[in-house]
């Protein structure tokens, strides 16, 4: 684009080209993002050709198509994050081939579109899986899955292929759908067990039946998610220009040596912009409740797009387990003590998180300070006291507290409102007392457990 004048020196040429690319970066960002959407759409549609229900060899055409579809849509959650958890998401899922009803809310769901049916008013939360395949003895089982009207699938919840979640039902966080369900039932855990549930009452105009003015307002806020897309592209151009400038004034070796410094600077910029966006769009977050069709939800989603689309690729993922991530999370509002080890940036509402001295949050953990049942976001604090440990890929729900020196094992779920006593060991989904690694039973009382 726009080649420099022949008499310009190498460094001047880099500067001129970079300036022109930065000026065009909004257009470049739009074309880049739409191209990615088109590639994902065409790929998934082509992969769906010939997929049929039944058992297929893992090493077969259908087996490869199903596997590849899930891999593409898993990657799309990162590459196309701004269009998820938006008014456009149901349309996107329909374009991919899923049967999606009206007034559906969907976040970063991974699904096999040609085998998915979602009823009117259903809610698919973050990182859910629908119509996922199962493997057994070298065979892959592929079957349709259905989410009934006004049913809810919580964060990392699953509705595997061949199963139906009946209308007005709920699958809790990190839980799976049982083989048989009845309408109006709630399920928790893996394997799932029945869960008592307190329904949240709210104005229908703020949950299921919003007026046109609220739909327009939400759309306007969601358009602001284009800002982090533009900043991501602009930062990429700036990094490329900086490396080109190093080559122009020195050699490739200089660019190789100082390239890390350039990337560190880019990461700092991305983190700083994300902190600024959080403070501008939502400010300090406090415990409470907010219906789906309210500006807090929309503003929070804009700020979260900065976190996932700008800070994550440029800073947060690479900074896992370093003091830099702790500084970033403190700037986002978290209270983190001395010597804390934090490998996960998934503290959705950091203002509501307290990590004591020497606390540990392992890789892949979610310190979940909100729940979204009945289209109302409930926010509450989560506390890990001094020396407490949350094992890899575990989730802790709002109003929970891990006592001093308490350990929660990998892949576990700490339920809402649970208080785990100091010096105890816990494991499971949901957690239960865990035998210590030295063979002694965990000395623990059963925690109090709130209804979902």
Where are these regions (language model features)?
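Conserved short histidine dyad/triad with adjacent acidic residue
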Residues: 83, 87, 101-106, 132-133, ...
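Glycine-rich hexapeptide-repeat left-handed beta-helix
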Residues: 119, 123-229, 270, 360-452
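Soluble catalytic regions of membrane-associated enzymes that act on cell-envelope
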Residues: 99, 105, 111, 115-117, ...
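Non-catalytic C-terminal interaction regions
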Residues: 80, 94-97, 101, 126, ...
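Transmembrane helix-bundle signature of multi-pass membrane transporters/permeases
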Residues: 30, 109, 176, 263-264, ...
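Residue-level signal for short amphipathic helical patches enriched in basic/charged
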Residues: 95, 113, 160, 331, ...
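Terminal amphipathic alpha-helical/low-complexity segments used for targeting or macromolecular assembly
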Residues: 1-96, 184-333, 421-452
């Amino acid at each position: 684009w726009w080649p420099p004048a022949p008499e310009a020196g190498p460094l001047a040429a880099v500067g001129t080209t970079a300036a022109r690319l930065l000026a065009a970066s909004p257009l470049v960002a739009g074309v880049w993002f739409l191209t990615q959407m088109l590639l994902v759409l065409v790929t998934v549609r082509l992969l769906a050709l010939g997929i049929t229900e039944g058992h297929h060899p893992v090493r077969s055409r259908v087996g490869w198509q199903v596997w590849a579809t899930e891999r593409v849509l898993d990657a799309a959650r990162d590459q196309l994050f701004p269009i998820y958890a938006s008014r456009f998401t149901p349309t996107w899922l329909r374009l991919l081939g899923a049967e999606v009803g009206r007034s559906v809310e969907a976040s970063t769901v991974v699904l096999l579109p040609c085998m998915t049916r979602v009823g009117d008013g259903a809610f698919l939360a973050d990182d859910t899986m629908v119509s996922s395949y199962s493997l057994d003895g070298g065979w892959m089982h592929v079957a349709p899955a259905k989410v009934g009207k006004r049913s809810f699938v919580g964060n990392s919840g699953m509705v595997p292929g061949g199963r139906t979640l009946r209308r007005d039902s709920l699958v809790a966080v990190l839980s799976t759908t049982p083989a048989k369900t009845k309408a109006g039932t709630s399920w928790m855990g893996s394997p799932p067990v029945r869960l008592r549930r307190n329904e949240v009452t709210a104005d229908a105009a703020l949950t299921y039946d919003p007026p046109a003015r609220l739909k327009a307002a939400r759309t306007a806020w969601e358009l602001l998610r284009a800002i982090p897309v533009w900043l991501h592209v602009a930062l990429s151009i700036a990094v490329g220009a900086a490396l080109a400038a190093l080559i122009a004034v020195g050699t490739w070796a200089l660019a190789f040596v100082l390239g890390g410094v350039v990337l560190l600077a880019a990461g700092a910029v991305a983190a700083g912009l994300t902190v600024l966006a959080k403070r501008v769009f939502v400010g300090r977050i406090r415990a409470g409740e907010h219906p789906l069709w309210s500006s807090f939800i929309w503003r929070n989603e804009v700020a979260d797009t900065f976190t996932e689309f700008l800070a994550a690729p440029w800073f947060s993922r690479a900074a896992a387990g370093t003091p830099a991530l702790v500084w970033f999370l403190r700037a986002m509002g978290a209270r983190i003590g001395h010597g804390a080890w934090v490998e996960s940036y998934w503290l959705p509402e950091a203002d509501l998180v307290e990590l004591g001295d020497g606390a540990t949050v392992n890789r892949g953990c979610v310190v979940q300070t909100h729940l979204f049942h009945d289209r109302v976001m409930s926010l509450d604090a989560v506390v890990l006291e001094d020396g407490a440990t949350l094992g890899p890929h575990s989730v802790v729900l709002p109003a929970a507290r891990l006592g001093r020196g308490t350990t929660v094992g990998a892949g576990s779920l700490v339920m809402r409102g649970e208080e785990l006593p100091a010096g105890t060991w816990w494991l499971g989904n949901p957690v239960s007392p865990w035998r210590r690694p030295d063979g002694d039973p965990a000395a623990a009382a059963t925690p109090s457990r709130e209804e979902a």
